[in-house]
C-alpha cells in the first residue's frame, strides 16, 4: 500500500472502540479484508481497525499468552534448557525467573517481548499469534537474561548490545530457514539464516537511544559478528 501524501498519523490515545455492528458479521469481514489488502484504506481507518482488533481479541490473546507461557515453561526443550542455565548463573543458584516475572501484557510497539534486569521478561500478548512464536520470543529473551548474568551486558555499549542481539536471534529459532523461506522465498537460500540474524540485530541496535542511525548500527553489528555468531553458549550448537 502506497503512502498517502501529507497524511496525518492518528494518535491511538484519541481512538475509541467502534460501534458493535462494526465489530462482527459482514462488516467486520469487510474491514478485515480491506486491512489485509490495503485497498481503499486511509491511515485513520487502518489505525481504527488495529485498535478495534486489539480490543476485540485482547482477552483471548492474554489468556492464550498465559497458557502458551505455562506450557513452554514445562515442556519446551529450549525454554527449560535456558531456565536451567540461568539458574546455575543466579545468586545462590536459585531460579530468578518464574510466572510472576515472566508476564503477558499489551505492548504499544511492534516488538514481541522484552527483558529488563530488574523487572523480568515481558511477552506482548497482542503481538503473539501462536504457541510456537511465543517459544521463539521467550527463548530470545532468556538468551538476553543469560548474557546479562554471564557477561554483564552493558546496553550503553553498542558492541555489547549488538552481540547479545546476534546471539538471541541465532539461538531462539526465530531465524530458522523455514520461517525465512515463508517470508522471502527461496532466493539466496544459503544466506537466509545469517541475513535474518543481522537484520534483526541491526533493527534492535538502531533503536538504542545512543545509536545515531541504522548505518552506525550496521557497522557495530558487523564489527562483532564473527565472534558473537560463533558463540552458541550455553548450547553446544545451533539446533533450532
From Swiss-Prot:
Gene designation: ATP23
Function: Has a dual role in the assembly of mitochondrial ATPase. Acts as a protease that removes N-terminal residues of mitochondrial ATPase CF(0) subunit 6 at the intermembrane space side. Also involved in the correct assembly of the membrane-embedded ATPase CF(0) particle, probably mediating association of subunit 6 with the subunit 9 ring.
Descriptive protein name: Mitochondrial inner membrane protease ATP23
Membrane topology: Peripheral membrane protein
Mitochondrion listed as a keyword: yes
EC number: 3.4.24.-
Chief location: mitochondrion
EC main group: hydrolase
PANTHER family with a match to the protein in the record: MITOCHONDRIAL INNER MEMBRANE PROTEASE (PTHR21711), MITOCHONDRIAL INNER MEMBRANE PROTEASE ATP23 HOMOLOG (PTHR21711:SF0)
Compartments it resides in: Mitochondrion inner membrane
Organism, as annotated: Scheffersomyces stipitis (strain ATCC 58785 / CBS 6054 / NBRC 10063 / NRRL Y-11545) (Yeast)
Entry's Gene Ontology BP terms: mitochondrial protein processing; mitochondrial proton-transporting ATP synthase complex assembly
Lineage of source species: Eukaryota, Fungi, Dikarya, Ascomycota, Saccharomycotina
Binding sites annotated in the UniProt record for a divalent metal cation: 140, 144
Residues of the active site: 141
Amino acid at each position: 500500500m502506497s503512502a498517502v501524501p501529507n497524511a496525518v498519523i492518528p494518535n491511538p490515545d484519541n481512538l475509541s472502540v467502534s460501534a458493535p455492528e462494526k465489530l462482527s458479521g459482514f462488516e467486520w469481514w469487510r474491514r478485515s479484508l480491506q486491512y489485509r489488502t490495503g485497498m481503499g484504506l486511509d491511515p485513520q481507518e487502518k489505525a481504527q481497525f488495529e485498535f478495534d482488533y486489539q480490543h476485540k481479541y485482547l482477552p483471548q490473546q492474554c489468556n492464550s499468552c498465559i497458557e502458551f507461557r505455562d506450557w513452554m515453561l514445562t515442556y519446551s526443550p529450549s525454554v527449560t534448557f535456558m531456565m536451567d542455565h540461568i539458574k546455575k548463573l543466579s545468586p545462590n543458584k536459585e531460579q530468578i525467573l518464574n510466572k510472576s516475572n515472566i508476564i503477558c501484557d499489551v505492548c504499544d510497539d511492534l516488538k514481541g517481548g522484552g527483558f529488563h534486569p530488574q523487572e523480568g521478561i515481558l511477552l506482548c500478548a497482542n503481538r503473539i499469534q501462536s504457541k510456537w512464536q511465543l517459544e521463539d520470543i521467550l527463548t530470545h529473551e532468556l538468551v538476553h537474561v543469560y548474557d546479562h548474568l554471564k557477561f554483564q551486558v552493558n546496553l550503553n555499549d553498542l558492541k555489547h548490545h549488538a552481540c547479545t542481539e546476534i546471539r538471541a536471534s541465532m539461538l531462539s529459532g526465530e531465524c530458522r530457514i523455514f520461517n525465512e523461506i515463508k517470508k522471502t522465498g527461496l532466493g539466496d537460500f544459503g544466506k537466509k539464516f545469517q541475513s535474518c540474524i543481522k537484520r534483526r540485530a541491526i533493527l534492535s541496535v538502531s533503536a538504542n537511544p545512543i545509536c545515531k542511525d541504522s548505518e552506525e548500527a550496521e557497522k557495530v553489528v558487523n564489527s562483532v559478528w564473527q565472534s558473537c555468531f560463533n558463540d552458541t553458549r550455553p548450547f553446544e550448537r545451533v539446533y533450532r
